[in-house]
Structure formats: C-alpha cells, structure tokens
C-alpha cells in the first residue's frame, strides 16, 4: 500500500472489493496503485467496532469519550499525525475519522480530548 509505505495483506470485504477494482483497472491499462486507507467494522453483540488505518507504528494513543459509557474513540498518533482510529459505538464520528486519517491530519492530544471541538472542523 503506497499510502502506508508498506506491503500488507488485509482481509475485509471492503479491501477485497477495492483491490479487485484496482486489478481490473490494471488489466485495462490504468496502472493507478492501490493506496486507500484500510478500514474495517464488526458488530459484536450490542457493540459496533470500527477501525481505520494501521495503528502498529503509533507513539501516542488518546481516548475521546467515556469508556464507562461504552461509546468512545481511540486516536493513534505518530509525531502528532493521525494514523489510525478505533471507534466503539461511535459510527457518526467514525465517518469523519476516516477522512481525518486519509488526510493525515496533524492534531494534538488536547484537541482530541476536548469534547467541545467538532471533529468536522478539523477537516478544514
């Protein structure tokens, strides 16, 4: 994955569909590399888990929301750049987080923790 700067095997419905489109385009002569930010979701009983990005190379993890309410997000940062987000029962915020990770937004932990900050405003 060019965007992640590594080779990576991912198994998800979305990834399989998008990579098959890339292969078909390559066969047709359009050699655009596959460089989408990976994302996944899973429903586990009454919890919706959603993940975007690859968090393995982070140097900071910041929680937004309350774990006790079982609705929160974990933001994974590397040198203040947002590289991944794990969302628990936070589907609306997750849609914004997908864009934030794709745009490689630089963000401070204080801003992430501040519930008065609208995540949409960080896309500007």
Model-derived features: positions:
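C-terminal auxiliary extensions adjacent to catalytic cores
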Residues: 68-124
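Mid-to-C-terminal Rossmann-like scaffold of FAD/NAD(P)H-dependent oxidoreductases
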Residues: 1-91
């Amino acid at each position: 994955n060019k965007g992640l700067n590594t080779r990576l095997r991912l198994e998800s419905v979305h990834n399989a569909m998008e990579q098959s489109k890339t292969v078909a385009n390559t066969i047709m002569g359009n050699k655009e590399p596959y460089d989408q930010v990976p994302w996944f979701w899973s429903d586990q009983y009454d919890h919706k888990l959603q993940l975007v990005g690859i968090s393995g190379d982070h140097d900071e993890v910041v929680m937004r929301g309350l774990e006790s309410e079982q609705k929160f997000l974990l933001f994974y940062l590397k040198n203040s750049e947002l590289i991944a987000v794990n969302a628990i029962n936070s589907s609306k915020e997750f849609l914004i987080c997908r864009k934030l990770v794709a745009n490689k937004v630089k963000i401070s932990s204080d801003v992430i923790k501040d519930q008065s900050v609208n995540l949409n405003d960080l896309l500007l």
